[in-house]
Amino acid sequence: MKDFSDELRVTGEYRVPGIYGASDSIVPKYNFPITPKENMVRMLKGENPLWVPNQILDNNAVQPLVMPDARARNFGGTDWFGIEWQYEPKSMASMVRPGTRRLSEISRWREEIVWPDLGEIDWKKDYEEHYKHCLSPDRLTYFVVVNGLFERTADLMSFEDALMALVEEPEELAGFYDRLAEWHIELFRIAREVYHADMILFHDDMGTQISTFFSPETYRQIFLPQYQKLTKACHDMDMFICVHSCGCVGALVPLMIEAGFDAWEGQESANDLKEVMDRYGKSLAECVYFELTEEMSGEEAKAVVHKYVDELGADRRFACRLFDYKKERGFSMSEELYLYSRMKYLE
């Protein structure tokens, strides 16, 4: 068995910007055989990464708080489109404040929507003050965009009316989404040119715990053309794009691939991720958030890590954000993920 201990020799540290309301953190820099960025790019392209990327250690994450959406979603307040968000301490997240509405009906989007001027924000100043010192070129940088196409519609006019608009006003939605896609592409360009992003993480939840909000055919007719614009724009800017979509949305994965997404950040508790990866892993990378609880013994935690690598890493299109909530294990589960996947990928 090959000895990888020297690859886990700490040679320095990285400062990691916080996202989703978290503080900045410090993570170790290891003596890896290739840079974490090169390994992550290999994973996204399906070109034989050497280990399963742990995005907490291997990626830079950017969610500038000069974006009203980021501040409102993380802490409460008013987002880019005038929606009031209320922070809920128990869930450590924000929800639209009850009674808030900015769009009376979808047919009035031209008259009622006030489009945010992205040029009003001093992006370069924000980069210089908050990110320039901590975005290592050794690590892939992804830029977080919340409130995607469907999410934004529900925020503006209520969830129920957004669903009704899909059925009753597809032409009006198409016009609104044309404009919203253009606005997002302008934001993507800022992410690339100012923050040097390598990937967009685009949030658009589309399911409940047991099913999708709408049929694959609705996705094909209404969302697919817009997503194809967004993914093409990212690729033309030499960026990857990962769609974060919670809920039981496995039925939409073939359409995500057709849309041109490079990866899907899916909800483990609502999807059979192994089945999805077995069927689509050669065409779409999977980025997963998973936790190791305080109650798990060391052996139990190791077994969970090994299971993820075995089941989701078969096509080597798997990355994760691994959180271990037990501080006193005596060994690093991030290092265990590295060692186990490093050996597994040699097989």
Please give the residue ranges for each predicted region.
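N-terminal accessory/capping or targeting/presequence segment of soluble
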Residues: K45-E47, W51-E88
